[in-house]
């Protein structure tokens, strides 16, 4: 039997065709029992059947296999569960005959509190605490609910039957076929599913209300939520029904199931899960309260619903063959969710906001410790770690880059062909490339392999010499060290206006292009500067390519002027800023030049551009403080000046008929001013917060600016005056809206007093905060609170490991607490602490976090060497 241990995949001698699964969850004892009968095709000589199982007790006496066309069931004399490998090995006394037989097993397990497998979530109903039973099987946890072939390529049909209390709602992937009441229990059986992977099977049992609608072709769509919250499901319902219609057209394949249920689960580890026909969500990703949710909450609901519904085609109908190709699922669903959201809400300018996805991808992929989009996965424990910004955000960004290169129409037609060819089966990355190649006639596989099979991305350096534009590519690393790698880079450039545009591929390390031939631009003889109508050259127009651009001084100056005069699109203004920030962090350009560029954004009012500038300002202020404490107040003062214009235009109160984007921007700008200690902002925020304490429905504190007010209150809290902090905790305890709770949690640790930060972190681990939400409390730890947070992490590590250690959330604890540091000593301390405590599922995150500390430390050293920085900051502030 030992020959089956230590293997990444199950042996191929038996293939499941159909599961008949019966489950009986006990929501009071938090246990479940079950039986499964599996139609199993024996395709090779074997005495063994090997399948996945974990955290289950299998009743040995219940195990039997009935060969094809036989009525005699064979018992399995040996039944062994290898816990570490999560496999169940059944050994029979004889070689099993080929063909489809039936394997039967009985088992029982515990409804765990780890938010994976078959688990329990708690909620209150009429003041009483109750349990619901929920499944979360992706990536490899169906095996914790029933023994199965728990790999995405082992697709089968599922016939599910549940035995549950009569007063509860019981949902699964398919519609109910019949219900039989038996005393205070009911037996609910569901229609048999189409062929699908185990990770998409879903069951939810609890008390729920729902709202209902239909798609244009009559498919029933419902949103389920806790009793009394049905109204909060209406927005998601509208988006869901419209999105299913939209994808039916886009993919040229109808939605394959008879119904779509979307349900809000109070305890949920991820944002949402695309189970076929029964999508589960965190409450914050599905529910929208007209009065107390912010515009950003509304947008989050729309994009998450669109993402999960895209998976019904891309992931569920066509499934990746193995987790190496996870990015096909996630990168694609991320990209196409923007397409759907843009179609439903064009005024949100969501494709400009897509840049935030690209930036997150570029940020992670700039690390030595990144990984390729297509990544080897050899153990179930490694899968969790690749649900990261590479699979989702870099994945989505390279799809956007390819669509931009091939054209939208060709891209769409090729995708429809791909889905048609692989429906109800599995695909690898090469299959997608083959479909796009057939549809476009372009060498897509050759073009894209450099982007998916090697990690990292290039920085393209641009300079003008003797009338030629010289481009050179090299791998970009945030550490500033030279990297290996070469890409086929789709270059787009404009000169002086968007009318003059050129696209070409940079296939070698470098190239020189005659500007007159390329764009009709004239360059003064012997000059290396552009002039006349060509006052600027922008490379990577619309940021369509997944790479960075480094301009020489004269090109950079031209772009800075074009930014200030708003001659560039918001997407290009964003790109110039983001590249400049990344190059500064990598010490390829000075902090002085980054700050000079930032001053060109003083009149900026675009939401996406300004919110990125705000994110950059937080980082620069903290790193400046690490380099030189005196510098910190100067840089804060400078950024307050940069944000004043937008703050003045937007004010505190929503204006009649203002845009969704202005509503989101107001909150971000006011939060930044509060964080930087702007006196007027702090006073006004506290005044409005006091009005809110007196009346939760006051118009003085609409949801879009609440976070700003909460952060302002925490800036003033300290150990001798905790009143503001205590008031916020009171609001937290009184609200039952998850979005309000997470908004408060995300503000508490921004307090500059380390004693309060310590209190906040202990509160985060209390029973008052759901395990899924603890990370919000860590997200905004102040510069002054870093050390306290690190000590706390070490002291509480055993508890944190026991509570979150089996899922991906534990990696977020490490990155949130470790990454903000900026000293080599701290990196060493972290390494020493984790030397005996790391596990395979957190190894990559730990290395990435330590690498970020090294990057910060090197950056601090280089800032210390910059001359006249304090004078420059003062000068920029006074302009």
From Swiss-Prot:
Segments of this protein annotated with the region Required for membrane association: 98-205
Keywords from the UniProt entry: Aminopeptidase, Cytoplasm, Endoplasmic reticulum, Hydrolase, Membrane, Metal-binding, Metalloprotease, Microsome, Protease, Zinc
GO biological process: auxin polar transport; proteolysis
Residue numbers annotated as active site: 308
One GO cellular component, as annotated: plasma membrane
Tissue specificity statement from the Swiss-Prot or TrEMBL entry: Ubiquitous with preferential expression in 5 days-old seedlings, roots, young flowers, upper inflorescence stems, and rosette leaves.
Binding site for Zn(2+): 307, 311, 330
Site (Transition state stabilizer): 392
Keyword Magnesium: no
Xref: CDD domains: M1_APN-Q_like
GO molecular function terms noted in the UniProt entry: alanyl aminopeptidase activity; aminopeptidase activity; metallopeptidase activity; N-1-naphthylphthalamic acid binding; zinc ion binding
Motif (Dileucine internalization motif): 728-729
Reported effect, residue 729 to A: Decreases protein stability and abolishes function
Disruption phenotype annotation: Loss-of-function mutants show irregular, uncoordinated cell divisions throughout embryogenesis, affecting the shape and number of cotyledons and the hypophysis, and is seedling lethal at 5 days after germination due to root growth arrest. Quiescent center and cell cycle markers show no signals in apm1-1 knockdown mutants, and the ground tissue specifiers SHORTROOT and SCARECROW are misexpressed or mislocalized. apm1 mutants have multiple, fused cotyledons and hypocotyls with enlarged epidermal cells with cell adhesion defects. apm1 alleles show defects in gravitropism and auxin transport.
Enzyme Commission no: 3.4.11.2
InterPro entries documented for this protein: Aminopeptidase_N-like_N, Aminopeptidase_N-like_N_sf, ERAP1-like_C_dom, M1_APN-typ, Peptidase_M1, Peptidase_M1_aminopeptidases, Peptidase_M1_dom, Peptidase_M4/M1_CTD_sf
Recorded topology in the membrane: Peripheral membrane protein
Note on domains (UniProt): Dileucine motif seems to be involved in protein-protein interactions.
Function: Metallopeptidase that binds to the auxin transport inhibitor N-1-naphthylphthalamic acid (NPA). Required for embryonic and seedling development as well as cell cycle progression. Homodimerization is required to proper localization and activity. May play a negative role in the regulation of PIN auxin transport proteins.
Protein name listed in UniProt: Aminopeptidase M1
Organism lineage: Eukaryota, Viridiplantae, Streptophyta, Embryophyta, Tracheophyta
């Amino acid at each position: 039997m030992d020959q089956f241990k230590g293997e990444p995949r199950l042996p191929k001698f038996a293939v499941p065709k159909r599961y008949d699964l019966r489950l009986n969850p006990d929501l009071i004892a938090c246990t479940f029992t079950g039986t499964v009968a599996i139609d199993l095709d024996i395709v090779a000589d074997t005495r063994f059947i090997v399948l996945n199982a974990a955290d289950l007790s299998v009743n040995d006496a219940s195990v039997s296999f009935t060969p094809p066309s036989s009525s005699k069931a064979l018992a399995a004399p040996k039944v062994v569960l290898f816990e570490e490998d999560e496999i169940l090995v059944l050994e029979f006394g004889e070689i099993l005959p080929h063909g489809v037989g039936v394997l039967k097993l009985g088992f029982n397990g515990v409804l765990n509190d780890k938010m994976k497998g078959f688990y329990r979530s708690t909620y209150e109903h009429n003041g009483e605490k109750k349990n619901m039973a929920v499944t979360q099987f992706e990536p490899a946890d169906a095996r914790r609910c029933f023994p199965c072939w728990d790999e995405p390529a082992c697709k089968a049909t599922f016939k599910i039957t549940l035995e549950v209390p009569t007063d509860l709602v019981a949902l699964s992937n398919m519609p109910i076929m019949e219900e039989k009441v038996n005393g205070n229990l009911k037996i609910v059986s569901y229609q048999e599913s189409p062929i699908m992977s185990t990770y998409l099977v879903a069951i939810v049992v609890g008390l729920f209300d729902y709202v209902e609608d239909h798609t244009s072709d009559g498919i029933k769509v419902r949103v389920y939520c806790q009793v009394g919250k049905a109204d909060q499901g209406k927005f998601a319902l509208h988006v869901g029904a419209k999105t299913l219609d939209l994808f039916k057209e886009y993919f040229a394949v109808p939605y394959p199931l008879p119904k779509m249920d979307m349900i809000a689960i109070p305890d949920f580890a991820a944002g949402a899960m695309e189970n076929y026909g029964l999508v589960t969500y965190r409450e914050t990703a599905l529910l929208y309260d007209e009065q107390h949710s912010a515009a950003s909450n509304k947008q989050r609901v729309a994009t998450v619903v669109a993402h999960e519904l895209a998976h019904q085609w891309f992931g569920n109908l066509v499934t990746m063959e193995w987790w190496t190709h996870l990015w096909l699922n996630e990168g694609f669903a991320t990209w196409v969710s923007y397409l759907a959201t843009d179609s439903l809400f064009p005024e949100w300018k969501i494709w400009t906001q897509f840049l935030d996805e690209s930036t997150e991808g570029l940020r992670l992929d700039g690390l030595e410790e990144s990984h390729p989009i297509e990544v080897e996965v050899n153990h179930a424990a490694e899968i969790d770690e690749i649900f990261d910004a590479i699979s989702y955000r870099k994945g989505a960004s390279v799809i956007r880059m390819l669509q931009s290169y091939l054209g939208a129409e060709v891209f769409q037609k090729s995708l429809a062909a791909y889905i048609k060819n692989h429906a109800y089966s599995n695909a690898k990355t090469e299959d997608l490339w083959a479909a796009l190649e057939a549809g476009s006639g372009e060498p897509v596989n050759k073009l894209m392999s450099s982007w998916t099979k090697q990690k990292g991305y290039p920085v393209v350096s641009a300079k003008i010499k003797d009338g030629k534009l010289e481009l050179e590519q090299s791998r970009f690393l945030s550490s500033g060290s030279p990297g290996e790698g070469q890409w086929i880079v789709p270059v787009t450039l404009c000169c002086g206006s968007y009318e003059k545009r050129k696209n070409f591929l940079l296939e070698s390390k470098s190239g020189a292009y005659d500007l007159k031939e390329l764009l009709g631009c004239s360059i003064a003889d012997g000059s290396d500067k552009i002039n006349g109508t060509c006052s600027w050259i922008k490379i990577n127009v619309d940021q369509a390519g997944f790479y960075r651009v480094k301009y020489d001084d004269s090109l950079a100056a031209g772009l800075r002027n074009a930014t200030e005069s708003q001659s560039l699109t918001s997407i290009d203004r964003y790109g110039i800023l983001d590249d400049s920030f990344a190059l500064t962090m990598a010490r390829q350009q000075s902090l002085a030049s980054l700050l000079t560029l930032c001053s060109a954004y003083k009149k900026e009012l675009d939401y996406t551009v300004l919110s990125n500038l705000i994110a950059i300002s937080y980082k620069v202020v903290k790193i400046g403080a690490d380099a030189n404490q005196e510098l910190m107040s100067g840089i804060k003062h400078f950024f307050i000046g940069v944000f004043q214009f937008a703050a003045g235009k937007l004010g505190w109160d929503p204006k009649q008929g203002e845009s969704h984007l202005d509503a989101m921007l107001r909150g971000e700008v006011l939060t930044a001013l509060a964080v930087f200690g702007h006196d007027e902002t702090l006073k006004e925020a506290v005044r409005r917060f006091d009005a809110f304490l007196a009346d939760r429905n006051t118009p003085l504190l609409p949801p879009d600016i609440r976070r700003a007010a909460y952060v302002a209150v925490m800036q003033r809290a300290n150990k001798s005056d905790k009143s503001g902090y205590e008031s916020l905790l009171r609001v937290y305890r009184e609200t039952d809206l998850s979005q309000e709770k997470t908004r408060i949690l995300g503000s508490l640790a921004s307090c500059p007093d380390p004693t309060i930060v310590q209190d906040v972190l202990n509160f985060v681990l209390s029973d008052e905060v759901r395990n899924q939400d603890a990370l919000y409390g860590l997200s905004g730890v102040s510069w002054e609170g870093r050390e306290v947070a690190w000590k706390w992490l070490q002291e509480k590590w055993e508890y944190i490991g026991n509570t979150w250690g089996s899922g991906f959330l534990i990696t977020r604890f490490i990155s949130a607490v470790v990454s903000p540091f900026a000293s080599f000593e701290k990196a060493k301390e972290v390494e020493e602490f984790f030397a005996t405590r790391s596990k395979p599922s957190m190894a990559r995150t730990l290395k990435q976090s330590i690498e970020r500390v090294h990057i910060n430390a090197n950056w601090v050293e280089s800032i210390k060497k910059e001359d006249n920085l304090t004078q420059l900051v003062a000068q920029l502030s006074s302009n």
